Amino acid sequence: MRDLLCQLASMTKDQIKQLIDRYLPGAGLVDTALKSVQLFRVTEPVPCVPAVYEPTVVAILGGSKEAILDGEHHVYDSNRYMVCPMTLPVEAGSPQASPETPLVGVMIALDPRIMRELAIEMETTSGALHKSDASPPQALTLADWDTDFTQALYRLVELLDNPVDTAILGPGRLRELYYAVLKGEASTAARRAFGVGNEIARTIDYLSTHLNEQVTIEDMADHVGMSRAVFHRRFKQATTISPLQFIKSMRLNNAAMKIAEGKTVSEAAWAVGYQSASQFSREFKRMYGQSPREWSHSAQASARLI
C-alpha cells in the first residue's frame, strides 16, 4: 500500500511539473490569476544573496533550491517542500540551476488570516495541542511531500489556465493547501506560528511594519507582554537568531534588496531605519564582505531573487 501511495504521489508530481512547463516554458518568475501563487523557472546558477522571506510555502518540481539562515544551509528539491511560517532574513539562491537541470517550482504566500483561522479551528476541534507541539514556532522547516499536500497542490495548479475556475474555486483550493500544510510534517512550526501561542511570529510582524523606526528589544518584548529575558530565550528558540541580530539582519537584507532594485545607498539606509549612512556601510560590509556600493555593482545585486 505504501509503495502504491508513493507511486501515485510521484505521478501527481510529474503532472504538476507538466502543468508548470505548459504555463511557463521559459525562464522567469510569473504571477498567476491567484495573487498568492507564483510560478518560477531558473535556467542559470543564482548565488545565494540577501533576501527576506515572507510567510511562504515553496514546492520544487525540478532542480534544487537553497536558503541560508544564521549560517545553516537548507537545501530542498522535489522530495521536500519548504515552509517559512514567519518573516525571516535569509540568503537564498539556486546555485545548481542550469538549462539542462532548471529549477522549477511554485511559490505560495501564506495568508495569515486564513492560516490563523484554520490553526485555531484545528486546535479547538482536536483539543489542546499535544505536549510535543508546545514549543515556539521553528524558523525554516523542510517537510516531506505527503499525499494530502501533493493532491492539494495539483488541484490548485490545474485551475490556473481557466480564469473562471480560478476565480470561483481558487480560494477554496488555497485553503485546502493551507490545511495540508497545517496537517503535514511542518505542522508544529505552522500551527505554533499561526495558532494559539504565536507571540514570536506576532513580534516579527510588528518589527516588519516598523523597520524604519528605532525598535528596541524592550519594545518587542512589551508588544507580547514578556520580560526581556523570557522574550530573548523564546525568540532565539524560534528563529535560531538573537533578537538584536534578527533586527540587524532584517534591516540589512531589506536594504540590500532595495539597492538591487536601483535605490541609492542613502535611500536604502534611511528606508530601513539607519540615521547614519557611514554606520550602515560599516555594518553592511561586516555582514556581506562588500561595501553597499561594491555590492550594487556586483553580479549578485542584479540576480533575480526567488
What are these regions (language model features)?
Residues 2-33, 37, 46-48, 133-138, ...:
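A short, N-terminal "cap"/entry segment at the start of jelly-roll beta-barrel domains
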Residues 29-128:
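N-terminal regulatory/effector-sensing and dimerization cores
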Residues 132-208:
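An amphipathic alpha-helical interaction segment
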Residues 197-198, 247-256, 294-306:
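Short, basic, alpha-helical segments at the C-terminal edge of helix-turn-helix-like DNA-binding modules
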Residues 207-210, 258-262:
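Short helix-to-turn junction characteristic of helix-turn-helix DNA-binding domains
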